[in-house]
Amino acid sequence: MGDHNLPDFQTCLKFSVTAKKSFLCMYRDSVSKEKLASSMPSTCDIQLKRAINDAYPGGGIKVTVLNSTTASLDSLATTHVKEFEIVIIPDINSLLQPDQAKLVKIMRDCTVAIEKAQSTRIFIGVVHWNNPVQPSGAAKDGDEAGKPAPKTRIFLPTSLRMGAWLKHKFWFACAPPYLDFESSTESSINTRANNSIGMAEEEKQEPESKRSIILNEEANLNDVFVGSTVRRYILDIMVHLRTHRLTYNAKAGGVYTNSLDDVVLLSRLIGLHSGKMFVSPSHVKEASRWYFPMHLELVQRSSMDSSLLYGSDPNLVDEMLEKLAKIKCEEVNEFENPLFLESLVVKNVLSKVVPPV
């Protein structure tokens, strides 16, 4: 993963299945709002389902795509999980607040069930994003010249339009799976299933072996050592992110208490994935680049900037945010990452916090 690119889907899926954590998948919006509101699964959802089945063929993992939001959430709350289940939530940004609250409760109950080793259910939220139109200059010729920007104008809108209490239920955000988008349809999936009849007997023996691999990864994960200096390094990163010039201090920059445990867990997985049984500062840096961009709350307008309390000019703050918005608009297209600016903030903090020797 590059400094400003989203993590790849396949690695995120593997990590999330091992850690039993939910995550978001960011799709660039090429689907009409009418299709997003449809009860039929979209091509994005079918593509995700195919990618999961390819990663765990016959691995005892059930994949469910929610169709009608409210009805499906109600059924999830009452359905008992007997196997490992991955639930795909289409267009999670469109959930109304009552549905968001209901989903938070379901995810909390699933976490409790996982801790009690009763059942395992994780969620993949699909986020459709689009690069906003590049903002125009603050001052125009003629009568509009010199007019200050409206106080309510938002220069840096977020692509994650959901409550913080729901967003923090997800681990991180990743890029879409690298599959043939045009062939990701139900008919192609059925064709692939028919063509694999000859492998049926072999696949019958795979669920137990796949399950044992997952269990072995979980056992090895607990053996990965995390030193006290490494934990202190993560805390230093969290403090610097909370007090960064571009993060919203009133919400601690979006860095909440459980971030320490989440980053430690992700660092362990990255260390284990690279063949190490300990966590090094380089693993923490990589985990921070994966984890924090999705959770950060950035200053979107001058009224959110704490420096106004110490005499900063709101018009100058708006001018700075407008210039940042132009940079973001250009770079988002290059990196295909709606969280580019958040990634830039994380990179800036990592360059300032000295890792342990």
UniProtKB/Swiss-Prot annotation:
Into which family does the record put it? Answer: Belongs to the MTC2 family.
Q: Which gene encodes it?
A: MTC2
Q: What does this protein do?
A: May be involved in telomere capping.
UniProt-recorded name of the protein: Maintenance of telomere capping protein 2
What species was this sequence derived from?
Saccharomyces cerevisiae (strain RM11-1a)
Q: Which domain of life is it from?
A: Eukaryota
